[in-house]
């Protein structure tokens, strides 16, 4: 890309010539391809836009592609601090979902292919942010219920639901998610909060193994 010199000046990245902090690495069984998305900042703090993703069949030869965000995202949030993407595939909707925070405004997109094109996936407020926060990560449970874990210090977990077109909504019907917040676009939404974790800061991530749930953070 035109700005690859900014990426490669001081990173010493052995895999791709990119500064790929907060990397979201995804292997897709459907395409037999590895994909890498990451925070969009230069090694010295420079902003590098538009965001890019990298993909490879063998983790040796990599290609990159610019991610074209819906224009309404950057019209509202700008192009600085494009952080911490997350990728998930929902077999029920047959859509890929991409989540990015831009200046602590979190947006979700969807596509039929990880190479795009990406369209806005916010069902409650099309083209707008889903919630205020950053470092949001998807988690899909064994029953295909999807969640988002996000924020810093006290991590929030939100439950998701989808309409027939594959658009995302925050599911407010589960009484377990008893706390509430709001924003001017989607109104009130519910979540549960993970509190009192010693030294918890940001970048929360959930995975499941042998029927146990694990929460990671920085």
Residue ranges and their predicted role:
Residues 1-218:
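Carbohydrate-active catalytic/glycan-binding domains of CAZyme proteins
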């Amino acid at each position: 890309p035109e700005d690859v010199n900014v990426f490669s000046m001081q990173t010493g990245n052995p895999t791709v010539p990119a500064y790929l902090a907060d990397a979201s690495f995804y292997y897709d069984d459907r395409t037999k391809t590895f994909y890498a998305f990451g925070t969009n900042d230069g090694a010295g703090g420079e902003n590098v836009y538009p965001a890019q993703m990298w993909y490879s069949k063998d983790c040796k030869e990599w290609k990159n592609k610019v991610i074209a965000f819906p224009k309404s995202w950057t019209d509202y949030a700008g192009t600085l601090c494009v952080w911490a993407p997350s990728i998930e595939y929902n077999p029920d909707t047959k859509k890929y979902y991409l989540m990015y925070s831009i200046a602590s405004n979190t947006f979700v997109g969807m596509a039929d292919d990880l190479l795009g094109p990406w369209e806005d996936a916010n069902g409650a407020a099309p083209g707008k942010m889903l919630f205020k926060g950053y470092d949001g990560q998807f988690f899909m449970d064994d029953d295909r219920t999807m969640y988002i874990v996000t924020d810093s210090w006290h991590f929030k977990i939100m439950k998701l639901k989808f309409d027939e077109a594959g658009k995302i909504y925050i599911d407010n019907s589960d009484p377990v998610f008893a706390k509430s917040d709001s924003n001017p676009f989607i109104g009130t939404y519910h979540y549960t909060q993970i509190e009192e974790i010693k030294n918890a800061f940001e970048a929360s991530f959930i995975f499941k193994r042998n029927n146990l749930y694990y929460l990671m953070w920085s």
